[in-house]
Amino acid sequence: MPRRRRVNLKAKGINAERELVHLFHKFGWSAVRIAGSGSSKYPCPDVLAGNGFRRIAVEAKLISKPRKYFSQEDVEQLYTFSKTFGCEAWIAIKFPDTSWAFFNPEDLEETASAFVASKDMIEIKALTINELLEVG
């Protein structure tokens, strides 16, 4: 992949994570984006959010294809961090021109070599931000 395209994809991911942080704040939660989360040797999510009662670790993905693949290592690291930190593990996916969709990593479909989130699965099992945060 050419360097310019990699930088653009990285910038889109960073902006998506920042959008998610703003969304949590809009609902009265505190949230932070963890810079370099995908390149750390230690397990860490993209976003941490909490409201004094609940803590959530979020792996955030902005995607345009109908399926998103996650390596077994990615899923294990999210679980490892969440268990050690004492928080819930969630995956957030945003398709173009849609709202964020949140789902538990347990909802991922397992293939021979990876886990996959399909658009169909997301439409059936995902929560909106209101449902995730139990607002309204």
Where are the regions that the model predicts?
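Conserved catalytic cores of phosphodiester-cleaving nucleases, focusing on short active-site segments
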Residues: 24, 47-64
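Short connector loops at helix/strand junctions that flank enzyme active sites
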Residues: 42-44, 53-57, 73, 84-86
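Short, charged, amphipathic alpha-helix that recurs within catalytic cores of restriction-modification
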Residues: 63-94
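Domain-level recognition of nuclease-like catalytic cores that cleave nucleotide substrates
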Residues: 7-11, 88, 94-136
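Acidic carboxylate-rich catalytic motifs and surrounding loops in phosphoryl-/glycosyl-chemistry enzymes
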Residues: 35-37, 93-96
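Active-site metal-binding core of divalent-cation-utilizing nuclease and nuclease-like domains
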Residues: 27-52
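Acidic-basic catalytic patches of nuclease active cores, encompassing PD-(D/E)XK
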Residues: 1-36
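Amphipathic alpha-helical interface surfaces
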Residues: 20, 43, 74-78
